[in-house]
């Protein structure tokens, strides 16, 4: 058959800016009409990060963390207690810079594993949910919990590609290629190696977005 030169890009669904992802796929369709085949790599899983506040990588794009990224746990604990730091972080969340993956969606930050037995009942719940239940600010709750556990609390943030309807729309797009496993990078934060089984289990079997043959 004839040789093809294909160009790919990567996109994810962002519930806070759903048109951005859609526009990229529309650009691909327009490129094909001009005779240029262009496809978007789209993951079928949420972009998820495991982290502790001892190495809060998902928050590093916020200027409140400038200058403290290499701090020791002891230094970080002192910073996280400071109301001025918390205010700066809140201001960052109110006015996020372009490219920031976390914009204050606390309902997408889960308490993965606690250090103290007394806090185990919060595991697998979101920071937003627990904070609302206690009528406190979610940022304060997260930092206070982390401080109580000497920054050992494990959190799980699901920051992009969240929302079945929006993600499913992009997965089904003719210019989408389900892929983008990040299994070889950022291993201390994330591993998407199981994306193939996730596609079959969720998007084929559970939701029926794809037939088995398509999957």
Question: Which role fits each region the language model picked out?
Answer:
Residues 210-214:
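C-terminal amphipathic alpha-helical interaction region
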Residues 1-208:
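Active-site neighborhoods of metal-dependent hydrolases
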């Amino acid at each position: 058959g004839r040789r093809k030169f294909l160009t790919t890009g990567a996109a994810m669904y962002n519930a806070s800016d759903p048109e951005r992802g859609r526009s990229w796929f529309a650009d691909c369709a327009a490129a094909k009409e001009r005779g240029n085949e262009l496809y978007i790599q789209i993951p079928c899983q949420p972009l998820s990060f495991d982290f502790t506040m001892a190495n809060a990588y998902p928050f590093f794009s916020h200027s409140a963390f400038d200058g403290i990224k290499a701090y020791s746990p002891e230094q970080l604990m002192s910073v996280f207690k400071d109301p001025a730091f918390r205010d700066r972080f809140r201001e960052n969340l109110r006015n996020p810079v372009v490219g920031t993956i976390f914009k204050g969606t606390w309902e997408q930050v889960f308490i993965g594993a606690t250090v103290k037995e007394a806090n185990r009942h919060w595991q697998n719940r979101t920071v937003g949910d627990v904070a609302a239940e206690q009528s406190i600010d979610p940022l304060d709750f997260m930092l206070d919990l982390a401080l109580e556990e000497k920054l050992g609390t494990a959190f799980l943030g699901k920051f992009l590609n969240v929302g079945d309807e929006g993600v499913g729309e992009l997965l089904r797009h003719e210019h989408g290629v389900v892929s983008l496993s990040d299994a070889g990078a950022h291993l201390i934060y994330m591993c998407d190696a199981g994306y193939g089984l996730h596609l079959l289990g969720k998007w084929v079997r559970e939701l029926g977005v794809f037939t088995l043959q398509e999957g």
